[in-house]
């Protein structure tokens, strides 16, 4: 098993960040459209906070894309990461989750997010073209 793990939430954040940048939208503008502070939005995009289903729909609306298009991009990215075998993709354990408490973090690998995850995804996208 790989040492490095990524969460579904951090993948969603990177997918959203890439789409936002592609459209030339600043974080603060998208945050405002979603009814969030720029700091709260930044935590979502970096994977430090998790998107709620409501926020995912609001984000898609603010980006001017269908929610299923956003979800499809996340699923494709997850599949590409799994195929690369460079990282393991899984739900990030929650502090109050029974599994997280029982494992005590001993066998939980390093979650990567933010710029490192973005670079990995961009690298994989370049290989698939």
Where are these regions (language model features)?
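Hydrophobic alpha-helical topogenic segments used for membrane insertion/localization
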Residues: 103-127
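Residues that mark the N-terminal boundary/hinge immediately upstream of a DNA-recognition element
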Residues: 15, 26, 52-55, 66
């Amino acid at each position: 098993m790989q040492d490095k793990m990524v969460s579904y939430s951090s993948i969603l954040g990177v997918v959203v960040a890439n789409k936002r940048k592609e459209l030339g939208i600043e974080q603060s503008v998208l945050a405002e459209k979603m009814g969030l502070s720029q700091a709260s939005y930044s935590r979502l995009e970096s994977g430090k906070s998790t998107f709620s289903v409501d926020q995912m729909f609001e984000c898609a609306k603010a980006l001017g894309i269908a929610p299923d298009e956003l979800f499809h991009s996340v699923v494709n990215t997850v599949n590409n990461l799994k195929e690369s075998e460079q990282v393991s993709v899984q739900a990030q354990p929650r502090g109050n989750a029974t599994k997280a408490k029982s494992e005590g973090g001993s066998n939980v690998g390093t979650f990567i997010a933010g710029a490192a995850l973005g670079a990995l995804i961009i690298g994989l996208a370049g290989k698939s073209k």
